[in-house]
Amino acid sequence: MMPRIVSSAALCAIAVLVAACASAPPSRFYTLSRTATPGAAPATFSVVVGPVAIPAVVDLPQIVVSTGPNQVTLEEYNRWASPLANNISRVVAENLVDLLGTHRVSLFQQSIPVDGDFRVAIEVQTFDSAPGDAATLNAVWVVRRARDGKSDTGRTTVREATADKSYEALAAAHSRAVYRMSQDIAGAVRALSRATP
């Protein structure tokens, strides 16, 4: 009698687990995207983007939603398709290709070391997500000229409204915020390319 009770309990537990898995919504994955359009005057210099540092609280696969001044929610079914720091550096590099008119833009994380005429380092201090409201980015960045170490440090603070309450609209708003930062960085690169030692 005891084995039959145990096996019935096990079957019930398995049935509950299967039902829970079957009812869970599918995960959705998002990326940031390039926003710039070609058209900048061509440049011949090269740029290396990275490293990019982000706050530990958002350095997660889940999209982290700000729900109050001291509270966040992890969106289990709405996730970034790749690590957020890599996502940001990739999109900044793609934007700089268009904004600077050069294809000689590479990522610091590449396995093959690349020496660029300029190095861009970014420290993201705020990366807030509020679906149906806005995406907020606050970042400090440094552009350093390789030949003499001359540098320019700047800060980009931007709040981009979302088009609707969807996470796709949130990712698009974050992409626009990263584009605004890319514009600031491109301006600093161009200024340093013209500056005398």
Language-model regions, residue ranges each:
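Mid-chain, structured segments of secreted extracytoplasmic proteins
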Residues: 74-104
